[in-house]
């Protein structure tokens, strides 16, 4: 069981690193089309977005926008945040799938 947890954690973090690399290497350095610029601006200025809101996204985007050296880098930082949060989602999805698969396949968890 200890060996399984070690391998599961290592593969999960490897999956995160691969996803983060792919997402961060393909981010849009500026504001793109549709809702993306609106979310970037509402995160940077903490203004009110359109009705769905996404307040957690805006608060975290505001945190990441403080790492920008100037205002022209805000879009890159918010898009980097989106890439890292998406990679984190893939990490937890991997761990969820392996947990459920192990639970379905094995009758006894000590195997």
Model-predicted segments: where are they?
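Membrane-water interface at transmembrane helix exits
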Residues: 22, 27, 61, 65, ...
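Transmembrane signal-anchor helices characteristic of membrane glycosylation enzymes that use polyprenol
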Residues: 6-33
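Transmembrane-helix motifs of polytopic, lipid-linked glycan transferases
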Residues: 13, 17, 80-109
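Juxtamembrane helix-capping/reentrant segments at transmembrane boundaries
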Residues: 44-45
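Short hydrophobic/aromatic helix or loop-helix immediately within or flanking a transmembrane segment
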Residues: 50-73, 80-84
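Membrane-interface starts of transmembrane alpha-helices
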Residues: 7-11, 70-81, 111
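Extracytoplasmic catalytic/substrate-binding loops of multi-pass membrane glycan-assembly enzymes
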Residues: 27-39, 49-61
């Amino acid at each position: 069981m200890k060996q399984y947890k070690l391998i599961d954690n290592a593969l999960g973090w490897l999956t995160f690193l691969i996803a983060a690399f792919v997402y961060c290497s393909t981010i849009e350095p500026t504001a793109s089309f549709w809702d993306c610029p609106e979310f970037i601006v509402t995160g940077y200025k903490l203004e009110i977005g359109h009705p769905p809101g996404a307040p957690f996204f805006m608060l975290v985007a505001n945190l990441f926008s403080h790492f920008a050296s100037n205002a022209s880098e805000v879009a890159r930082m918010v898009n980097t945040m989106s890439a890292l949060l998406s990679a984190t989602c893939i990490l937890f999805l991997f761990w969820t799938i392996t947990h459920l698969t192990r639970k379905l396949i094995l009758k006894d968890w000590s195997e």
